[in-house]
Amino acid sequence: MRKAKIRIILGDKLMIWYPYVQMKKMKTPYKIVDAEGVYLYTQDNKMIDSVSSWWCMIHGYKNKEINEAMKNQIEQFSHVMLGGLTHEPVLKLSEKLKDFLPGDLDYCFFSDSGSVAVEVALKMALQFNINRGSGRKKLLSLTSSYHGDTFMCMKAGDDEDYHFILSEDDKKDVIHIPTEMDALEKVFRTHGNEFYAFIVEPLLQGAGGMKMYSIDFLRRARELCNEYDVVFIFDEVATGFGRTGNRFVSDLVLPDIIVLGKALTAGYIGHAVTVANHKIYNGFYSDKDTDALMHGPTFMGNPVACSAALKSIEIFERENYMEKIKHIEDMVRNLVSGFTHPLIKEIRYMGGCLCFQVHDPSCLIGFQEYAYQRGVFSRPFLDIMYAMFPYIIQDNEIRQIVDVMKDWFTEQKGI
């Protein structure tokens, strides 16, 4: 009886362990009863999803074509293991990605989440070096980076606000540098022959603070990775499929391994992929069983997920999304041009992303509920208020989101 009463008071909080929150302090989450287009619906409200449900819902909700593709595949068969079996959707998606991605990024290893796909990329790079007799053990990454929440991803990241459980000993083989040329040159001169890989979120660092940096840094990093024979990994889980204003940053600078997730399936079902070039793949291709990549997620290459990804990519190409993303960026530029406030440290935007960084994170307390009352779902983090726009968003909806963000500051009392 006591447990039943607690459930009535707390609702689902008793049974669900939510992410990135101290459960004892957590406010009751908004309960979604429907979603369509760019809108989320609660029992008594309608709000624009300004963050694309953690940056993945590029086509919005209830896209009929994706729903139909998934339904058709479910009616045929919903899943088979990829060990010893294969199927048409995974073959088609692999072929499509081979054509869709730049250079010789041809070899697809599928996973069920972005974090796992990053783990696979790091494992590939490390074993690639082991297979060729190299004793390299160090990993190079960036400050303010985030690559996921599984163990190697936590080590690669530089995000103490998320992964404070790691000790210095846990990260002894990882070096983090800022996105500055001098730091890049120095670390390669000092440790270049010790690195098995350099992993980056290219151009846009997401959960580490929405930091943006120059393509010139990546171009020089590519040259140094070539010079020191270091595997260059692009974590494009968040940046891929147009988020930076480029289809992929890999179109501008070619990595050895690219990781895709989130928008790969447009958020309709979890799936991710690690794609390697010929050099990496050939480092495993031999007569030795011990050279094989010993990894195999249960749901890798799930046929329903592959069907969703194929349809999502088809829509992305057919609807000329790169023009849509350019329009979003141009409109955001006009809407924030000249806007300043003492609480705001910097306003940044790139492609389909807008970020207000504040001096003091406490000034964002209450913004989520404020936005909700104004018909916008937002979820600020650290010292960041941001939007990751769905690509189907209309001009009036962009304006509504940006106005809510700006008005929060202009309505602050005593500032």
Go through the PLM ranges and name each one:
Residues 2-415:
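Conserved N-terminal phosphate-binding loop of PLP-dependent enzymes in the Aspartate aminotransferase
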